[in-house]
Amino acid sequence: MLQDQTNPTAHEPDAVVFAHSTEEVAALLKHCHAHHIPVTAFGAGTSLEGHVTPVQGGISLDLSQMNQILAVHDADLDVRVQAGVTRRQLNGELRDRGLFFPVDPGADCTIGGMCATRASGTNAVRYGTMRENVLGLRAVLADGTIVDTGGRVRKSSTGYDLTRLLIGSEGTLGIITEIQLRLFGVPEATGAAICQFTSVAGAVSSVIEIIQSGIPVARIEFVDAAQMAASIAYSKLTAMQALPTLLFEFHGSEASVAEQAQQAEAITTGYGGAAFAFATAAEDRNRLWQARHDAFWAARASRPGYAVFTTDTIVPISRGHVGDGNFHVMILFPDTPEAAARAWALDREIVAQALDLGGAASGEHGVGLGKREFLRREHGAPALAMMRAIKTALDPRGILNPGKILLDAPTSDG
C-alpha cells in the first residue's frame, strides 16, 4: 500500500516493477500503452502531494535501482546520472572532485523525482531550482518512445524547450530516466548565521533589503516562533529563544564570506534583529541546518499523538516570507475525522490567500493530488486547456500517473 505522511489515503498497485535501464522502461511502457495499464513512477517516496500514489492501480515503476552516475565532466561542470541517483549519493561522489550539486530540498530525494516535481530548496535564492540546474534529459514517452532533450550546453535557442516541459510534469508526460545536471565548485569558505527578532515584520523587511542590496546569500530561511519552540526542544538548540528567526548561509572566499555576514548583520540590526551569531566551523553549521531539515519531526514531537498535514505555497517576499518566497506550513491536529476536515479547510484558505497575494498554489511540493483544484484559478482556463492538450498529445490513453495535476485528464480506460 502506498501513501505519504500528509495524504492518508492508501492505494495498492497491481504490481511493482524495478527498472534498471531506459530500455527496460521503454519496453514496459510499450506493453502498458498497448494494454491500457496505468504506470506510476516511484523514486524515494519523499513527495508530499500524493505523486507516487497509484490511484488507478496498475504498475508502480520503481526507479530506485537506476542509481548509476554515468559521467562527470569536471572541466565543463556537468554530470549525467540515472534517475534513481539520490542527492546525497551524488554529492558524496563529487566531494573529492571539489564539485557539488546545489539543489537541496532537505529530504534525500532521487534526482528523477526532483526533476518530476520541479524541486528547489533552502539555497534556491542563490543557485536556483531544478529548472535552472538541469541541462538535458532522457525520457520515455507513454508509447515507449525514447526521447532526448537539451544537452550539455548552458543555453540553446533552437526548438521548443522540451526539457522544461518535462521538469515539473510529475510523471504525467513521460518517465525521466537520465538527467544532465549543472554543477558548481565547492566554495573556498562557508559561513552560517542565525538572528532572532521580536516580530515577523522585522525579519521579512531585513530579507527584502538584503536581497535588494545584492548580498549573494547562499541560503536564507525564516522560522516562526512556534516552530522555533519545537526545534529548540527537539534539536537541543538551548542557546536560542522561541522567537521569529532567520537562518543564513554564505559562500565564497574567507574574506567575502566575512563581508557578507557583516553586511547582513548591519541590515538585520536596523530592523530589530538581535544576537546575530556567525559560525564557520562545519559542525556548528551542519547542526544549525540539520535542525531546519528536522523541522517536520520537531513539530510532530511537540504534539505526541497528533496527525500532521504539511503544505507549501509561494508568495512575493514582501508578502511575508523570505528568500524565494516559498511558504511552508505544518498543521498539527488531533487524529480524528473532524479535525482532519478542519486541517484540510485551513490548507485551502492558505492557498487561496497566497493566490490573492499574487503567489502560487505550490512553490516546490508540486500539484499531485492535493493542489489540482487550484490550477484553473492560478493559471486561467486558456492555459489549463493548453496543459490538457499537451497531456492528450503525449499520453492519449492516460496511462502515465493518472489522476495527477489535471482533474479531467484522459484516463487509462479512455
Residue positions per predicted region:
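Noncatalytic alpha-helical scaffold of FAD-dependent oxidoreductases
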Residues: 1-414
